[in-house]
Amino acid sequence: MRAAQDQRTIKRSDTGTIGTRGAGSFVRREPARLRRGGQGRPDVSGAGWHGARWTSVCVLASVLALAAAADAADQPQWGERYTRNMISAETGLPDSFDPATGKNIKWIAHLGGETHGTPVVAGGKVLVGTNNGDPRDGRHQGDRGVLMCFDEKDGKFLWQLVVPKIGGDPYLDWPSGGICSPPSVEGDRVYALSNRYEVMCLDLAGQANGNDGPYLDEGRHMAGRSGGAMAVTPIDADILWIFDLIKDAGIYPHDAAHASVLIDGPFLYVNTSNGVDNTHRKIRAPDAPALVVLEKATGRLVARDQEHLSPRTVHCTWSTPAMGEVNGRRLIFFGGPDGVVYAFEALKTMPPAGEVAKLNCVWRFDCDPEGVKENIHQYMGNRRQSASNIKGTPVFYKNRVYVAAGGDIWWGKELAWLKCIDASKTGDVTKTAEAWSYPVNLHCCATPSIAGGLVFITDLGRTIHCVDAETGKPCWTHKCRGEFWGSTLVADGKVYAGSRRGDFCILAADKEKKVLSSIDLDSPISSTPVAANGTIYISTQTRLYAVKKAAP
């Protein structure tokens, strides 16, 4: 089995050609279920603790200033640390590549049959969520959620987290959707969200250093409803703790779990994926939180929002939180499922055992104040009039928050905007904090990239937009073949983005549009490219590409 696994990595040879690709096949046809109008789902990117109080030796502003430099080599989470800006400090990145000839290809690894996860890179490993369409372990047959771990050097498969489906209603855990959430890595710990809505702490080494506790039931977890326990092997994940959002936070999930854990010292901030039921007209858990905070060491629930967002949830709670410091106060920025951006005061102290604190809301900004506010689910499927929601992540940059909001991709109006919000105000700032608003095409589930005074963002209108970060005035747009579910990456003076038609575009990150290259990849792209250690990583539906500029 190991030999077969190794053959699934396609390496660049000395002559620049591609060797055997082993099992599996390249897929060029976009599945009908995943075309626009179907029900496929997008990838919609600390200090020590002493006693009961986290003490910081410097203010968060200093940490944010140093974050890019400190994490420039690895890419251990969705976007830039804290701010979630979709940029990288990496240099020497390629402006073109060609899988057919091997040009600038470091390696290619096989994933499952459907991949919506964005890779993260940390500690010499690459992790990405996918499904079980191409099983690495013959014991696991059929639909599963999978988080795969590869060796950063050569793409060798190391270990995987395999999670059974919830079963029953497909709207709870969408068929073939796999694990969609990008994990977050700190040191030797991986914080991930499974397809069963479980926040997990994993050992980055997998089982290579033994099955660490306190959680020791990996075998039962893998077996799922089949009962009993499977043998834990060297290619299985090592789970340290689990927090079940359904059982322990009371959510009623919808479609697919999506969140990238925000790590802040001893705290983990996680959006909950609470949503509508299979009728798309009812919220089964109206009192469930939209945002929770867990204790990093144990997974204990320590805080939640108190904004009662769930009854106003248009579809589901998929936006990942960001963080920044404004006027000396650390704030958590959260894109609500009701189309409102919330700024919460970050926790300063750990609540006592058994206590669940309430997050303090500092300000709220309604991205669509003229949208439908009453009986919002009666407008499901209305492409002209509906409530708005937020699927991408708010980005904090120079005391401003940049975020995309608008009609739901599958059920809402065909209007969406990129908003720029002054983050320094308090209260309901809807009428006072908007710096500018820029309309995008159709719908948008992307997270912005902000660099060099410019903002770059994709949309479902097959367009990459470049606008002035200060004024919101358009600089240029670029049409690609497919709609975008993922976001742009800006790095080394270039803009990288891949579409649902499998075309991968590279442009200059400048006020004047310059197309550097367009590459035709094997299958649709739902994810966002990332950069780490001089390499670009791109996950398509079936492949993980490591793209690195060849030595002269």
Residue ranges and their predicted role:
Residues 52-67:
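Bacterial N-terminal signal peptides
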Residues 68-552:
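Noncatalytic, solvent-exposed loop/strand surfaces
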